[in-house]
């Protein structure tokens, strides 16, 4: 009987069976969307925020991050994850700025903020100007249409050449332009969804979790989410809908590295899971999953 180095008969097959891992998973090709960027490590960015505090850039988009104007209180998935990171790192003074989404990168580069703390995804254009933390959580895009899907949209390819709404500066906007859609951009998801509801645009591509919040808050609306449409691999892998991360100036390598270590610990110890559950999500949103249930 052949024995593996672990002393188990059958080698990898037995190990896979013990771990409850499907055998076909061993053949899965895994994708690394973002490699190491340690060129500037040794800078003082971590020491600076430990001493002077940190300014987080959020955008008022539920459920990612929200600002209650009556109490000036911040809440949301990204707000709570970033606060947990700050606590883990020992950052005592946490401040917020609330630029529009399209102004997040300019605000970071001008040093108005220290972190793009409204989650941001890797795409080729962004990698040229900022760096990214390790993964925090995951969600995907969804195509939104008038209820009943009168034009019979069946795939993202069907959006080519059509007028499609998206949030300005978003991964959805970049993808739609790349596939040849005529993109109408909006400053906020509220304006975007109102325009779709009122027929000013016929289609929108938006974050699935944003629509879920809208759907619960607006019973009887006339928008349909096409959950049966699979997200193309090129919108997920390097196309702007991979892992939800946080953004940093390229020179702030120590801060970014510390953030990434903190996120790894908080994902591992259940903190991120608890935050996701608080906003109606689950551990399914910790890793990439197929979007056509």
Enumerate the predicted regions with their spans.
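Acidic, polar ligand-binding/catalytic clefts
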Residues: 83, 94-158, 233-235
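Extracytoplasmic small-molecule ligand-binding "clamshell" domains
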Residues: 28-119, 128
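Bilobed "Venus flytrap"/periplasmic-binding protein-like clamshell domains
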Residues: 60-63, 72-88, 120-121, 139-194, ...
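Extended ligand-binding regions for polar small-molecule ligands
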Residues: 26-40, 79-88, 149, 163, ...
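Periplasmic-binding protein-like
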Residues: 138-145, 216-260, 283-293
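A ligand-binding cleft/hinge motif common to bilobed small-molecule-binding domains
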Residues: 119-128, 178, 202-240
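Hydrophobic residues within well-ordered alpha-helices
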Residues: 85, 108-109, 159, 196-197, ...
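Bacterial N-terminal signal peptides that target proteins for export
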Residues: 1-10
């Amino acid at each position: 009987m052949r024995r593996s180095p672990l002393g188990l008969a059958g080698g990898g097959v037995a190990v896979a069976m013990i771990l409850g891992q499907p055998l076909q998973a061993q053949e899965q090709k895994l994708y690394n969307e973002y490699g190491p960027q340690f060129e500037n490590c040794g800078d003082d960015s971590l020491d600076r925020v430990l001493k002077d505090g940190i300014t987080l850039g959020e955008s008022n988009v539920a459920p990612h991050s929200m600002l209650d104007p009556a109490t000036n209180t911040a809440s949301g998935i990204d707000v709570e994850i970033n606060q947990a990171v700050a606590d883990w790192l020992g950052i005592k003074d946490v401040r917020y700025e609330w630029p529009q989404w399209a102004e997040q990168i300019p605000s970071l580069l001008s040093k108005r903020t220290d972190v793009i703390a409204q989650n941001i995804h890797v795409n080729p254009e962004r990698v040229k100007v900022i760096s990214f933390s390790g993964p925090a959580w995951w969600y995907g895009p969804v195509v939104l249409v008038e209820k009943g899907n009168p034009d019979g949209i069946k795939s993202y390819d069907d959006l080519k050449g059509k007028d499609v709404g998206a949030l300005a500066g978003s991964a959805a906007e970049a993808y739609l332009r790349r596939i040849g859609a005529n993109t109408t951009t909006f400053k906020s998801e509220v304006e975007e969804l109102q325009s779709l509801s009122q027929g000013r645009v016929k289609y929108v591509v938006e974050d699935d979790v944003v629509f879920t919040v809208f759907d619960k808050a607006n019973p009887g609306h006339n928008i349909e989410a096409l959950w049966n449409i699979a997200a193309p691999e090129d919108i997920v892998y390097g196309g702007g809908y991979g892992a939800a991360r946080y953004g940093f100036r390229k020179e702030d390598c120590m801060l970014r590295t510390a953030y990434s270590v903190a996120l790894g610990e908080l994902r591992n110890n259940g903190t991120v899971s608890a935050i996701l559950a608080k906003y109606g999500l689950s551990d399914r949103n910790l890793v990439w999953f197929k979007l056509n249930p």
